[in-house]
């Protein structure tokens, strides 16, 4: 396997290493802009709903489809090198389809809410926490500091924490279409 270490030339690809952070920042900044330029009854529940929609679109949809599916399926060898995986494995294709499926679900959250949001958030978070554990394991056990292995260990933890935290706050505010409402 190829592993990026120290001052490896690939380590300087800052744009590639921060894509998940950019998506997370967009999912935070765009709803703030949305709130600033629109009027409406901005209750706590409505604000949380808005943040959730942006989080599903950017942190699940874009990350899964644009930055998971497309690289793993159409640029598999380059993605493998950046992660520190062997080239030519069908596993890349399988991972890409998996990411693409979650990406589609993230985009669909614009049209569906309630239990669909809950299932999407829990499933995506389970995958992301598992991916974070895999990245950390690769770092500890194999010294794999390849750009696409090291940095995702952080974002694959932060994104699901943010998404689940938003969903929990939305639920507490009476969201999820009134389903699973907490006792008051």
List the predicted regions and their residue ranges.
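Membrane-interface helix-boundary motifs at transmembrane edges
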Residues: 40-56, 111-116
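Hydrophobic alpha-helical membrane segments
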Residues: 98-102, 120-136, 158-162
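Non-cytosolic membrane-interface motifs at loop->transmembrane helix junctions
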Residues: 81-90, 144-155
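Hydrophobic transmembrane alpha-helical segments in integral membrane proteins
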Residues: 12-33
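Membrane-helix boundary connector in multi-pass membrane proteins
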Residues: 110-120, 133-150
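A loop-to-helix transmembrane entry motif
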Residues: 56-61, 85-101
């Amino acid at each position: 396997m190829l592993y990026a270490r120290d001052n490896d030339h690939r380590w300087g690809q800052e744009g590639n290493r921060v894509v998940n952070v950019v998506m997370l920042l967009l999912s935070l900044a765009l709803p703030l802009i949305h709130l600033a330029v629109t009027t409406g009854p901005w209750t706590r529940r409505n604000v949380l709903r808005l943040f959730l929609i942006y989080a599903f679109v950017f942190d699940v949809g874009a990350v899964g489809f644009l930055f998971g599916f497309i690289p793993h399926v159409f640029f598999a060898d380059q993605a493998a090198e950046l992660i520190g995986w062997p080239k030519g494995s069908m596993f890349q294709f399988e991972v890409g389809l998996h990411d693409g499926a979650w990406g589609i679900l993230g985009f669909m959250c614009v049209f569906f809410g309630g239990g669909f949001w809950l299932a999407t958030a829990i499933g995506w978070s389970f995958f992301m926490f598992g991916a974070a554990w895999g990245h950390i394991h690769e770092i500890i056990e194999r010294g794999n500091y390849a750009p696409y292995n090291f940095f995702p260990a952080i974002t694959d933890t932060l994104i699901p924490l943010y998404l689940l935290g938003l969903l929990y706050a939305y639920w507490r505010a009476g969201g999820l279409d009134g389903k699973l409402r907490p006792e008051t």
